[in-house]
């Protein structure tokens, strides 16, 4: 196997990953190199056309990702936009992120994958992905290939110039999409500043900017969302990052929607998951789904902290 992934290789890898079987370390390296090539050409505000199905956090819940594709349609038949947090917490971060990256490399025009706050070296060392890579490969190389790749993921996407999609939320340092386009994203997620805020902030019932209980990013009120949408000619901010019990939740007088796509989050929260389908004319509908039937989860001791639910 050379360092070139042919279409035939990719199809075979995708087939294997669909069965929840991991790739070899060498195959992952080849895949990540190819993905970097593709992602390096994408913008900080990646343009996406409708129709497209928008998804929130997946967090290594591989069987629920399979359920998501069953409900929403297979890739590439359905166009997808994922808003980050592919790894950590679930038991199958390796298979989940490898599959999404393989689909991106195989069908680059049909799937968009954004960066979430968990697509970071620091966070993955605490919340499970690093340990899982060590357990499944016997060393940290695969973790390194993926976390290096994460620096290339676009920060936000813009669907038909109107619906702005990102993982976390708005930033007091950013008024316009051009400010986002000007950021240097090829780095670890910083502890503060605009790039950090886009991946960490949350909408709030209180107006204005507030200090985030997460220790990174800000909270922002309806006044902020309305101003941002008006300034940038947007109809909606679509984001993920927060567990919502019904899988989706409107706030800020429908200026913001939260979408969460990991059902029964952490295998214990009891929430539904959802997808937002945008049709040819940007009309939205939500599809809710429950966890895939489980055939015995692995008995893994969980040592990850419960903070940041």
Swiss-Prot record:
Mn(2+) 1 binds at residues 57, 59, 85. Changing residue 85 to N: Abolished protein phosphatase activity. It catalyses: O-phospho-L-seryl-[protein] + H2O = L-seryl-[protein] + phosphate; O-phospho-L-threonyl-[protein] + H2O = L-threonyl-[protein] + phosphate. Mn(2+) 2 binds at residues 85, 117, 167, 241. Binds 2 manganese ions per subunit. Keywords: Hydrolase, Manganese, Metal-binding, Methylation, Protein phosphatase. Its EC number is 3.1.3.16. Belongs to the PPP phosphatase family. PP-2A subfamily. PP2A exists in several trimeric forms, all of which consist of a core composed of a catalytic subunit associated with a 65 kDa regulatory subunit (PR65) (subunit A). The core complex associates with a third, variable subunit (subunit B), which confers distinct properties to the holoenzyme. Component of the Integrator-PP2A (INTAC) complex, composed of the Integrator core complex and protein phosphatase 2A subunits mts/PP2A and Pp2A-29B. This is Serine/threonine-protein phosphatase PP2A. It comes from Drosophila melanogaster (Fruit fly). The lineage of its organism: Eukaryota, Metazoa, Ecdysozoa, Arthropoda, Hexapoda.
